[in-house]
């Protein structure tokens, strides 16, 4: 995908299906390829089990093709994009025209929402304390030096 060689840690059948699992589906224009069917099927199983599934850009098309966006709030690169790339898409009434959307255990984003999507995933996984997350997001969304120092002040001391 994207010209990268990816060596997975496990096979799709080895992915634990429980509420602690997290599946990240990166953006690309190859998601309509049938070879991705197994991971999209697993995404559906994970969503039903309460696991977190995160999809950005072209990966949202595969979720739409599988009907996984038909009945819950979501976003993508535009409703027209989903309609064009997924002829059976029926989630128009749930489409939210914003860069990234969190609906319980589903996090979707347009390609322009990558930073917000990352923030929402980090928040869901509780990687940072809330003040660190806020400073991290402020710094990376603005590039302002003051937020870099704010971020550094929230991190634990390495002493």
Regions inferred by a protein language model and the residue ranges of each:
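Active-site-adjacent pocket-lining segments in enzyme domains
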Residues: 4-54, 58-159
